[in-house]
Every structure is written in structure tokens, then in C-alpha cells.
């Protein structure tokens, strides 16, 4: 559907808000004020719901090729970082100015999917279409690609520990991986259910 839902966990009451036409949000992220931001996966937008006025504010991508915002995360400065999977891009939105910057991944078809921040606020991105992780320079948006072992490797989601170890699920090979940015070492563990898990 094309709906944003708000659940009151104390009462169980659910309130639904119809999103702008064609949005079809893939995910929702909360900023430091608990304002819900959505990523318009079908219409190239990012936006939020003002909980006081119950009205939407929508930002259109500045590039027509940036068509599918996917997953997002806020840094401590309030900057919203997000992936655009099939557009093969990473985005950066400054909510104060509305300025959006985009960067294209170096490998065609990488399909950036999940995004997390390390302890310094540096964004890390998983590649669902290629065997890579991508580190984003938070100041310049320069992208550094880390090649992961295995041509069948595809990663959707990441988790980063307090000491900045980057864990990822290798859904293409049924493994759990860990990348150590300090020494470049990659460690892999088999999932209990095997390579098709």
C-alpha cells in the first residue's frame, strides 16, 4: 500500500496517513525529534510527516535517474543519508536547507541496499548486486569500495559494532561476514542452514 502507519503501543490504536500519490515507501527512519521520514521508492522522493500539522513535506531528487530511494539513516548532525538501490546511488539530504547531494557507486549494478554509520558518523553501505561494501566520506561524499570474497556474494543489511567492526549477511552464499576496517581483514562464518539460507 501507499500508507504510513502510526501505532500507539500503550493503547494499540493505529492511525494511518495516505502518502503522496506514487510514493510506495520502502522504509521509514526517525530523526532526533522522532519525526518519521519515508523513502519514496517509486517516485524518487524523500519526505516526512509533521506530527503536529499531520501534513507531509516532500523533497524530490535533483536527478531524474535517482528514482528509488530505499533505506536511510540520520547522523548526529541531522543529515539524512540514504541508498537508491536500482539507481546505483547514495544520497545525502540536509533537512535545514533541503539540499540533496548524490554519488554514483563505482561498480555498475552494485545496488546499494542497507546503510549504517560507524562511531565517527561515517556511512557504510551494503551492495545487493555485487560483492562489495562501500565507505562514504561524510564530508566529500567520495566513495571507497571494498571488494568482498566470492563472486556470488550479495549483502543486504549491515550491523556495525561500537569498535567499528562491520558485520554483514552474505545472502548470496549463506554466510555471515565481518570486515575489519583497521586492517582490512575479512572473516566469514557459515550459516547453520547452509549456503541457501
Language model regions located:
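Conserved beta-strand positions in repeat-built beta-propeller and related beta-rich domains
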Residues: 1, 36-42, 80-86, 123-129, ...
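A generic tandem-repeat structural signature
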Residues: 1-3, 24-29, 38-48
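Short intrinsically disordered, low-complexity coil segments enriched in acidic
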Residues: 1-15, 52, 195-197
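A short loop-to-beta-strand structural motif that recurs across blades of beta-propeller domains
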Residues: 2-6, 45-48, 89-92, 132-135, ...
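Short loop/turn segments that connect beta-strands within beta-propeller blades
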Residues: 8-12, 50-54, 94-98, 137-141, ...
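A short beta-strand motif characteristic of beta-propeller blades
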Residues: 13-18, 55-61, 99-105, 142-148, ...
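Beta-rich, blade/repeat-based domains predominating
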Residues: 21-34, 64-77, 107-126, 150-165, ...
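Ankyrin-repeat and related helical/solenoid repeat scaffolds used for protein-protein interactions
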Residues: 172-197
Amino acid at each position: 500500500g501507499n500508507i504510513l502507519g502510526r501505532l500507539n503501543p500503550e493503547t494499540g490504536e493505529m492511525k494511518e496517513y495516505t502518502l503522496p500519490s506514487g510514493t510506495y515507501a520502502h522504509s521509514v527512519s526517525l530523526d532526533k525529534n522522532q519525526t518519521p521520514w519515508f523513502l519514496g521508492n517509486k517516485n524518487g522522493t524523500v519526505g516526512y510527516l509533521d506530527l503536529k500539522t499531520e501534513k507531509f513535506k516532500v523533497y524530490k531528487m535533483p536527478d531524474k535517474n535517482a528514482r528509488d530511494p530505499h533505506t536511510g539513516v540520520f547522523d548526529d548532525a541531522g543529515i539524512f543519508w540514504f541508498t537508491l538501490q536500482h539507481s546505483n546511488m547514495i544520497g545525502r539530504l540536509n533537512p535545514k536547507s533541503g539540499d540533496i547531494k548524490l554519488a554514483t557507486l563505482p561498480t555498475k549494478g552494485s545496488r546499494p541496499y542497507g546503510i549504517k554509520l560507524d562511531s565517527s558518523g561515517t556511512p557504510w553501505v551494503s551492495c545487493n548486486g555485487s560483492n562489495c561494501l562501500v565507505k562514504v566520506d561524510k564530508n566529500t561524499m567520495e566513495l571507497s569500495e571494498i571488494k568482498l570474497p566470492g563472486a556470488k556474494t550479495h549483502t543486504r543489511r549491515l550491523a556495525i559494532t561500537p569498535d567499528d567492526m562491520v558485520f554483514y549477511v552474505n545472502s548470496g552464499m549463506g554466510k555471515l561476514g565481518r570486515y575489519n576496517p583497521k586492517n582490512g581483514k575479512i572473516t566469514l562464518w557459515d550459516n547453520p542452514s547452509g549456503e541457501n539460507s
